[in-house]
Amino acid sequence: MDIFNNNKFYEGYEGETEVIFQILGDNNTSIHLWNGYIDDIMNHQPGTEDDFKNGLSRDWNTLEGPYSDENNNVIDIDDYYNDLLRFAGVKFKYEETKEVYDLVMYFLKQAKENNQEVEVIVD
């Protein structure tokens, strides 16, 4: 999977909300995503409200972390990865969302294996 300045899942959505996962201090190792794909993932959350207290689910639902106005963009990779594991096997609205999900999981796994920090920017 290509994680070198990958814009594939934002092309055609310029001007709409963009979510960028990037290695802290390395703008070239990044994936740029249309927020609609993230919304699609989050709109298919399995479980109960108690399951929304971690990772991307928490930040998306409560407008914390990258979704806040405070620019708190460095994420806990394990927190995000483990939260997103709950979505494995979910059928999403958009066909491309599964590819986005797989790409985000791959990106987080690679960052963890390489002891890198990840920041998420919602713009």
Task: Label each region the model flagged.
Residues 1-106, 110-114, 123:
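Acidic (Asp/Glu-rich) sequence patches and key acidic residues
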